[in-house]
Amino acid sequence: MRIIQILNTFSYGDAIGNHALTIHRELIKRNIDSKIYARVIDARVREYADLYENYIEQKDDTILYHLSSGNDLNKEILKHRCKIGLNYHNITPGEFFEEYCPDIQKNCNLGREDLKRFKDKVDFVIGVSDFNIQEIKELDFNCKLYTIPILINFNDYNQTSDSEVLKNLSDGKENILFVGRIAPNKCQEKLISDFYFYKKIYNPNSRLILVGNPDGIENYYLRLKRYVSKLKLQDVIFTGHLKFAEILSYYKKASLFVCESAHEGFCVPLVEAMYFNVPIIARDCGAIKETLGDGGIILKNYSPIETASVMNKLMNDEKVQNLMKENQNKRIEKFKTKYIMEQYLEALGCNGN
């Protein structure tokens, strides 16, 4: 038996790439034959994967196909005759990008149409959240369905952080953080509005740090910059691309993590913030609540001024912060590799190893 993971793009440092690599390493540890194939492979992870064109199917293979976008591979994968499982990471609805990037909108819409092709043609589906599996159920998939969180290698977070960033963030200002692609579904404009009222009413000695890249959605990024200028708002930082050591520094120096996303299939940064015991406030949407659990405060339909008030109360309530940290530590245990990998082994039919 071989476990064959297939992705369209095997990237370095992104959540799905890290997830696939962790599965691969854990399978190898258990002496299970494991391979990763992709159409596009980042040079930094080239040693772990081969091009999809080089894959030669064997009858006892089990393919785990990672679906997160629209691409030609979504059709090609169904030509294989071995056992096929779908790892569904969710696809952002295209309407979020209509105003900013028609190409991304088209890709997202294509991906959601492609998802329907897998109905009755795969042996099982793994969704990284109940939210994702609910989408699969609504399409009437007739196969085994599993909700298993994404695998996160927490050892990576023990690496040395960037000393220069740590120094720059240690100037006495309160650091309000969000980590995620600069994209309309992440709703960074809401974060800017929240921060505007928080800084104006409660704490002028604070900054908002938006970690992430526009990555093809520059029109949205420029809109955010114009909005900041219109508000005459100081201390809003767009970091752009960062090294991993720099990202670690931002988490370590964060006073508060705020998430206003309107669509999330899992949201790895919430888990990262919990790992670093950063107090969290998040909007209730998609898989946010099930990922966060009791590790933060969930808000529903709060205005920016109301959110700013909650931010202030949390920042000034040490008792609530301490309880939140205890809950975060308990919650993180649910995402540990050993626990999650046991579930993947069962779904893949390797639970005897």
Regions found by a protein language model. Give the residues of each.
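Nucleotide-activated donor-binding/catalytic signature segment of Leloir-type glycosyltransferases, i.e.
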Residues: 221-245
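Short hydrophobic beta-strand element within catalytic cores of glycosyltransferases
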Residues: 270, 279-282
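Conserved donor-binding/catalytic core segment of Leloir-type glycosyltransferases
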Residues: 126, 167-186, 192-195, 209
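Short alpha-helical donor nucleotide-sugar binding micro-motif in glycosyltransferases
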Residues: 249-254
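Donor nucleotide-sugar binding/catalytic pocket of nucleotide-sugar-dependent glycosyltransferases
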Residues: 119-160
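Aromatic "clamp/platform" in nucleotide-sugar-dependent glycosyltransferases that forms part
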Residues: 262
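Glycosyltransferase donor-sugar binding loop
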Residues: 39-42, 207-222
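Conserved acidic donor-binding segment of nucleotide-sugar-dependent glycosyltransferases
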Residues: 297-305, 313-318
